UniProtKB/Swiss-Prot annotation:
<protein>
    <recommendedName>
        <fullName>Cis-prenyltransferase 4, chloroplastic</fullName>
        <ecNumber>2.5.1.-</ecNumber>
    </recommendedName>
</protein>
<dbReference type="GO" id="GO:0009409">
    <property type="term" value="P:response to cold"/>
</dbReference>
<dbReference type="GO" id="GO:0009570">
    <property type="term" value="C:chloroplast stroma"/>
</dbReference>
<dbReference type="GO" id="GO:0016094">
    <property type="term" value="P:polyprenol biosynthetic process"/>
</dbReference>
<feature type="transit peptide" description="Chloroplast">
    <location>
        <begin position="1"/>
        <end position="45"/>
    </location>
</feature>
<keyword id="KW-0460">Magnesium</keyword>
<feature type="active site">
    <location>
        <position position="84"/>
    </location>
</feature>
<dbReference type="GO" id="GO:0000287">
    <property type="term" value="F:magnesium ion binding"/>
</dbReference>
<dbReference type="InterPro" id="IPR001441">
    <property type="entry name" value="UPP_synth-like"/>
</dbReference>
<dbReference type="Pfam" id="PF01255">
    <property type="entry name" value="Prenyltransf"/>
</dbReference>
<dbReference type="InterPro" id="IPR036424">
    <property type="entry name" value="UPP_synth-like_sf"/>
</dbReference>
<dbReference type="GO" id="GO:0009507">
    <property type="term" value="C:chloroplast"/>
</dbReference>
<dbReference type="GO" id="GO:0004659">
    <property type="term" value="F:prenyltransferase activity"/>
</dbReference>
<keyword id="KW-0808">Transferase</keyword>
<dbReference type="GO" id="GO:0009668">
    <property type="term" value="P:plastid membrane organization"/>
</dbReference>
<keyword id="KW-0150">Chloroplast</keyword>
<comment type="similarity">
    <text>Belongs to the UPP synthase family.</text>
</comment>
C-alpha cells in the first residue's frame, strides 16, 4: 500500500494527531466499507461441522464466487487476526506512526469485506492489548481516537450490511465516549448475522481465564453449582467469547513476521491452525489473506487423533 503525500501534508497531519488525539479528522485515509456482496454466505445458512472445523453449506443458501484456489466446504468458520506491524510500516516509509495506524484501518476494511463475501462467519481482531497501555500516551490516544472515529463512521454501514459487532476485553478503562459508542454499536447490530465482527480491546487472554475461574468459584461458593460440575465446557461459557456462536478460531493469522500469541485468546486457540505472515499489517490484503486460507485448507486438523 503506497501513499502519495507531500512533506507538508505529513507534518500537518502529525501535528493534528498529537495535539488533538480525541478528535482526529485527518482526511488522507478514509474508512469506507464497501458493500458486502448481497449473495454472500449468511451465518444462519451454515451448519457447524465439528469434525472438520469448517462450515457445512446449507444447499438453499445462494453463494458468491470464491477464488478458484479455495474450496467452500473447507472455509474456516472463525478467523482471528493479530494485526502487527503498523508502526514498522510507517517507519519504513518515513511517516508518522499515526499514519501507519490509519493505513492499518484500510487493511481492516478490506479483510471485513472479504470475510463477508467469502462466507467466514466470525472475524476476531486483536485491536488493543491490556499491555498496550505501556506505550507512549500520545500513541494510546491516537489508537483510541482512531477506533472511536472508525466505529462511528462505519456503524451505519455495519448495520446495513448485516455485520454484528461485539467487543471483548475490559472496556471500563476506555474513554467514556468510546464506551458509549461501543454500547450503541453492540445494541444496533445485535440481530445481524452475515458476519460477526469481534474486536478485542484492552484484552488479556490470561485475565479472561482468571475472570472465568473467579466467576465459577463464586457460583460454587453460592451453591449454584458443585465442584464436580466444573469442566471445559463450563469454563468456556464464562469466557468473554461466550458471545460468539463459534468461540474457538479455526485459523489465527499474525502479521509482520512475529511468532508468538501475545496473550491473545489463550484458551480458545487450543486447536487453532496458525499462520504467520511476513507482511506488515497495512500491506496485508487479498493476496495475503488468500495465501493464509489456502494454507489452512491444505492442513488436516486432527484434534489429537491419528492422521487418516
Amino acid at each position: 500500500m503506497a501513499f502519495s503525500l507531500q512533506l507538508q501534508q505529513i507534518f500537518v497531519s502529525y501535528t493534528r494527531f498529537c495535539s488533538q488525539p480525541k478528535s482526529i479528522t485527518n482526511p488522507l485515509i478514509s474508512l469506507k466499507l464497501p458493500s458486502i456482496h448481497p449473495l454472500a454466505f449468511a451465518q444462519n445458512a451454515a451448519v457447524s461441522n465439528i469434525d472438520t472445523g469448517v462450515a457445512a453449506i446449507d444447499g438453499s443458501a445462494e453463494e458468491v464466487s470464491l477464488p478458484p484456489q479455495l474450496r467452500r466446504e473447507l472455509m474456516p468458520k472463525h478467523v482471528a487476526l493479530i494485526m502487527d506491524g503498523n508502526r514498522r510500516w510507517a517507519k519504513m516509509r518515513g511517516l508518522p506512526v499515526a499514519l501507519g495506524y490509519e493505513a492499518g484501518i484500510r487493511a481492516v476494511r478490506k479483510i471485513i469485506e472479504l470475510c463477508g463475501n467469502w462466507g467466514i462467519m466470525v472475524l476476531t481482531l486483536f485491536a488493543f492489548s491490556s499491555d498496550n497501555w505501556l506505550r507512549p500516551k500520545v500513541e494510546v490516544d491516537i489508537l483510541m481516537s482512531l477506533f472511536e472515529r472508525a466505529l462511528n463512521d462505519e456503524l451505519e454501514n455495519f448495520a446495513r450490511e448485516g455485520i454484528r459487532i461485539s467487543i471483548i476485553g475490559d472496556s471500563s478503562k476506555l474513554p467514556k465516549s468510546l464506551q458509549d459508542l461501543i454500547a450503541k454499536a453492540v445494541k444496533t447490530t445485535k440481530e445481524n448475522s452475515r458476519l460477526h465482527l469481534v474486536v478485542a480491546v484492552n484484552y488479556s487472554g490470561q485475565h479472561d481465564v482468571v475472570q472465568a475461574c473467579q466467576t465459577i468459584a463464586q457460583k460454587v461458593k453460592d451453591d449454584i453449582i458443585e465442584t464436580k460440575d466444573i469442566n471445559s465446557f463450563l469454563i468456556e461459557q464464562e469466557l468473554q467469547t461466550n458471545c460468539i456462536d463459534f468461540p474457538c478460531p479455526d485459523l489465527l493469522i499474525r502479521t509482520s513476521g512475529e511468532l508468538r500469541l501475545s496473550n491473545f485468546l489463550l484458551w480458545q486457540l487450543a486447536y487453532s491452525e496458525l499462520f504467520f505472515s511476513h507482511s506488515h499489517w497495512p500491506d496485508f490484503g487479498e493476496a495475503e489473506f488468500l495465501e493464509a486460507l489456502c494454507s489452512f485448507q491444505q492442513r488436516q486438523r486432527r484434534y489429537g487423533r491419528q492422521s487418516s
